[in-house]
Amino acid sequence: TITGDHRLIQYLLNFSRPFIYTTAMPLHAAVTIQFAIEMLSDTKEREILQSNITYFKEMVEHFKLQDIFINSASPIQSAVFASPARVKEVTMKLKERNFDAKPILSPTVPLGQERIRFCVHSYNTYDEIQEILFLLSTFV
């Protein structure tokens, strides 16, 4: 249901007919989307990304950081700290060493659960992953 004045209703009736009277996605759109999904799931980049995520998690354990990291299988990994000041301090130290980790502060997350977000990419090297986690281990 759409509410509005007479002019709005008339405009929508006259210029939105394909949307108003359509009940399903066109077949060609569904086929295109399916093809895109298949292409994305079969790419070498995706395999490399998954390998990097696995390596990141292994290095978290190697450097004994699992107590601060949220368990996640996604490319977005988060280390939780008890204070926003500590998150800012550690993030700044990482930036000084050319690592782009992002602080996530309250009110985006609950107070006392501030965190540093790490985004793992397919183009990251194992050396980069190891170095950032080594640095993090020296800062915590």
Where are these regions (language model features)?
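Active-site PLP-lysine loop of aminotransferase-like
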Residues: 12-25
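Structural motif of enzymes handling amino- and sulfur-group chemistry
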Residues: 24-42, 48, 52, 61
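Predominant activation on well-ordered alpha-helical scaffold segments within soluble catalytic domains
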Residues: 9-13, 30-37, 54-57, 133
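Cytosolic Rossmann-like ligand/nucleotide-binding regulatory domains
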Residues: 104-105
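Active-site PLP attachment segment
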Residues: 1-11
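Conserved PLP-binding catalytic core of the aspartate aminotransferase-like
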Residues: 45-57, 61-98, 108, 113, ...
